[in-house]
Amino acid sequence: GLGDVYKRQKLDRFCQFAVVVSDQAFIDSGLVKEKINGDRAGVIWGSGIGGMKTFYSESVNFGTGNGTPRFNPFFIPKLISDIPAGHISIKYGFRGPNFTTVSACASSSHALIDAFYNIKWNKADLFIAGGSEACVLEPGIGGFNAMMALSTRNDDPKTASSPFDKDRDGFVLGEGGGALVLELSLIHI
């Protein structure tokens, strides 16, 4: 989980999702942290946007203030897309490959593919890989709406999200995260 309130306040929502789903995946794997060679374990995380809430709230606070350039010292660390991979690696003591894929809606898929290939190429034996996003707020909704990327089927929520339908008209914005534990013994190459 996220631990104490202090830690939650230091993490953007997209990073909170990442930590929680990584913990769930690790617990589900049945692995024991102390039995893992940290030098052969890594984290590859995907996020297309990163800490949008942090960027938005800090910018609004600055804009409505007296013009003094005073930002929270955690402003940049909270919003950069690769911060979840760092937090997860530190939590589990993983010192192997650690990076983030940023490729829009495919970021999480690319993270999983990169983890698979890093195992195949003998760069590591185990990865926590996945992705998270948290952009359901004014600039996220407004930005995707301005691009005309959101579904306009507001009258029927059951049909609004239809990505494979020939009559689709956009996507439904959501947030959350997902993670898998990939390990050498389960990949048959």
Which residues does each predicted region cover?
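Acidic/polar N-terminal loop/beta-strand segments that form early-domain functional surfaces
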Residues: 14, 46-48
